[in-house]
């Protein structure tokens, strides 16, 4: 009868466990908005085709591609994000272990001598006791109301959010690297323009000085020519300083010391070529592709599951304890048949007298979920805003560049004609100075416009989260183990 009662005691919680459900709300992902196209998508500049992978390869710059690959391998921000993702996966594995019994092995040996006051008639040897024991103990929380399962669900969502954070960091790092590289090439072009204009102005100064010596010029023209040359030369140190700073930044982005890339980057190369058309895809694809949206959605899932964890504390918590071992007064008898010990116990822990605290935790969890929902919705709107803004900036930068190209070409021709006309005495030197100043401003403006257009294109790809899909598969997956159901 005793054995039958114990068996029923054990079968009851096991039966309840099989029929258990997880309390708290079941998560349902918010529906993403579906738009036909981006508002700023002009047909001559963009297409609705899928965003290209590895967009930086489209610039046709082997050195840029090498630097991006090196950043993927060694960038410290990416290493930090990867370590955080590994940590979240470790916590997920730990939480999943809570679904199974916790089993420990234990052993001990003790020697005790009882006081002669307690046993006045016993000899010393009779007052000495030894005890030896060994066994295996198990503790299992019977998850009747889904507290453990909801905790695992929340941790899995957090792990998936950390994977999205890693992908977001890839977007940030590669986007910054490409932008800095484009700025470097633009600054080198500005430096070339300044040096070329300085050379032209030296020639003009030499011409003025020659006319002065021949008695056909004025000291005033010579002074103005020298002032213009010095003004142009003054631009060069600032440009060289910015070039050095960006070179150092690119080295750090690839995980190196600041001076490591000087030799590879000091030789100027043309600005990366811009695309005639950019594939931007559809807004719905953009929202599904953005890692920051994925991270926000996963954290909303985690916050929703945490409501279930808090709600489960309203109900009793059942634990099943078991012990199987041996205990004897000597090591020789430790594994004898009569030394066997066992224990099976069912425990109940119920904080119904403290329900006020539990309900306060539930309210806090619910508020946290509401905050995460608002954060998710805000992230979606920001993603659309960034894409629209980046597309508008790229479109306008191309139009600006078109006008500046024409201005630079015209100002170069005007400067050439002004020097010819001055040489034959048709105009005074003031016309030459004005023409050369206009040429410098136009060519420098064109170089800056090329940088703005290229960085706007990179910003567009960052907003679209394009070019990183293949890289996104590399991080360790939170779903390496089967997902848990919460029925």
Can you say where each PLM-predicted feature lies in the sequence?
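Terminal intrinsically disordered/low-complexity segments used for targeting and assembly
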Residues: 2-13, 18-73, 132, 156, ...
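Short flexible linkers and secondary-structure junctions
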Residues: 22-176, 317-322, 341-343, 355-362
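Membrane-embedded beta-strand positions in outer-membrane beta-barrel channels/transporters
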Residues: 68, 133-137, 181, 283, ...
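Sec/SRP-type N-terminal targeting helices
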Residues: 79-80, 96-97, 142-170, 220, ...
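Periplasmic alpha-helical coiled-coil/stalk elements that build and connect Gram-negative outer-membrane
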Residues: 148, 163-282, 393, 397, ...
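A short glycine-centered flexible hinge/capping loop motif at secondary-structure junctions
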Residues: 212-216, 422-426, 463-467
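Short terminal targeting/anchoring segments
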Residues: 218-220, 426-447
């Amino acid at each position: 009868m005793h054995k039958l009662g114990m068996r029923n005691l054990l079968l009851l919680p096991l039966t309840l466990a099989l029929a258990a459900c997880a309390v708290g709300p079941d998560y349902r992902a918010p529906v993403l908005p579906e738009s036909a196209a981006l508002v700023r998508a002009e047909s001559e500049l963009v297409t609705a085709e899928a965003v290209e992978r590895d967009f930086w390869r489209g610039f046709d710059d082997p050195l840029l591609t090498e630097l991006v690959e090196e950043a993927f391998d060694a960038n410290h921000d990416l290493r930090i994000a990867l370590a955080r993702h590994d940590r979240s996966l470790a916590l997920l594995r730990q939480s999943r272990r809570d679904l199974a019994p916790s089993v420990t092995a234990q052993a001990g040996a003790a020697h005790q001598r009882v006081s002669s006051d307690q046993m006045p008639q016993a000899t010393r040897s009779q007052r000495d006791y030894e005890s030896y024991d060994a066994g295996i103990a198990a503790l299992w929380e019977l998850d009747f109301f889904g507290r453990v399962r909801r905790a695992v669900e929340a941790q899995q969502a957090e792990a998936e959010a950390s994977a999205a954070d890693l992908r977001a960091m890839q977007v940030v790092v590669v986007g910054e690297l490409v932008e800095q590289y484009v700025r470097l090439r633009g600054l080198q072009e500005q430096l070339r323009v300044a040096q070329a204009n300085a050379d032209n102005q030296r020639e003009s100064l030499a011409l003025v000085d020659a006319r002065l010596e021949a008695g056909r010029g004025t000291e005033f023209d010579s002074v103005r020519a020298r002032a213009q040359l010095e003004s142009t030369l003054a631009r060069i140190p600032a440009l060289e300083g910015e070039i050095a700073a960006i070179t150092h930044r690119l080295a750090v982005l690839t995980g190196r010391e600041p001076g490591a890339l000087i030799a590879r980057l000091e030789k100027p190369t043309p600005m990366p070529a811009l695309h005639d058309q950019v594939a931007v895809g559809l807004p719905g694809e953009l929202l599904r592709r953005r890692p920051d949206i994925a991270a926000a959605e996963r954290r909303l899932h985690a916050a929703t599951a945490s409501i279930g964890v808090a709600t489960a504390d309203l109900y009793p918590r059942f634990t099943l304890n078991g012990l199987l071992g041996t205990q004897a007064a000597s090591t020789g008898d430790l594994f004898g048949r009569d030394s066997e010990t066992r224990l099976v116990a069912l425990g109940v822990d119920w904080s119904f007298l403290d329900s006020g605290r539990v309900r306060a935790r539930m309210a806090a969890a619910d508020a946290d979920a509401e905050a995460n929902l608002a954060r998710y919705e805000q992230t979606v709107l920001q993603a659309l805003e960034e894409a629209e803004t980046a597309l508008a900036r790229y479109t306008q930068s191309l139009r600006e560049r078109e006008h500046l190209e024409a201005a630079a070409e015209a100002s170069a021709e005007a400067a050439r004609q002004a020097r010819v006309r001055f040489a034959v005495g048709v105009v005074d030197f003031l016309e030459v100075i004005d023409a050369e100043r206009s040429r410098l401003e136009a060519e420098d403006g064109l170089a800056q416009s090329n940088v703005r257009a290229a960085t706007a294109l990179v910003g567009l790809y960052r907003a679209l989260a394009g070019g990183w899909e293949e890289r996104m598969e590399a991080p360790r997956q939170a779903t390496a183990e089967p997902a848990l159901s919460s029925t």
